[in-house]
Amino acid sequence: MPDRRGDRGRHQARKRAVDLLFEAEARGLTAEAVADSRAALAEDQDDVAPLNPYTVLVARGVTEHAAHIDDLISAHLQGWTLERLPAVDRAILRVAVWELLHAEDVPEPVAVDEAVELAKELSTDESPGFVNGVLGQVMLVTPQIRAASQAVRGTGPAEG
């Protein structure tokens, strides 16, 4: 089922994924490792709610594709390096770029809009515009990246 603008469950799942990525970076772990530890904690303690499955999917996806995601973000930063960005902005961009590349049920404008909303909630006054600008540039190349990925896997329209 495609993601829709009013889907607050997905919004909260994205926000939690940003939290996990932020925590993982601060602790020197992968987002997947942090998600796994939270899942174990939820199993052991009744007062700890389990993570939304979409949060776990995003954490695993960002971990699996971290190098490619970071390269893509870095290629579209103008006057910045990934390391100089606020950690929360890095986490937001990583979630959004993963969605742009790998979440086929999430329309690109929704992924960008959700990232901008998260930047408004969690970061500086300048961050929403910055995040929107970077993701707007990334969106220009995502169709080619998705097509190349499908061709490598031997699926989709690139097959011929």
Swiss-Prot record:
Question: One Pfam match, by short name?
Answer: NusB
Q: Gene Ontology terms, cellular component aspect?
A: cytosol
Q: Does Metal-binding appear among the keywords?
A: no
One GO BP on record is: DNA-templated transcription termination
> What functional role does this protein have?
Involved in transcription antitermination. Required for transcription of ribosomal RNA (rRNA) genes. Binds specifically to the boxA antiterminator sequence of the ribosomal RNA (rrn) operons.
Q: Entry's PANTHER family? A: ANTITERMINATION NUSB DOMAIN-CONTAINING PROTEIN (PTHR11078:SF3), N UTILIZATION SUBSTANCE PROTEIN B-RELATED (PTHR11078)
Which family is annotated? Answer: Belongs to the NusB family.
Q: What is this protein called?
A: Transcription antitermination protein NusB
**Native source organism of the sequence:** Mycolicibacterium smegmatis (strain ATCC 700084 / mc(2)155) (Mycobacterium smegmatis)
Tell me the gene name. Answer: nusB
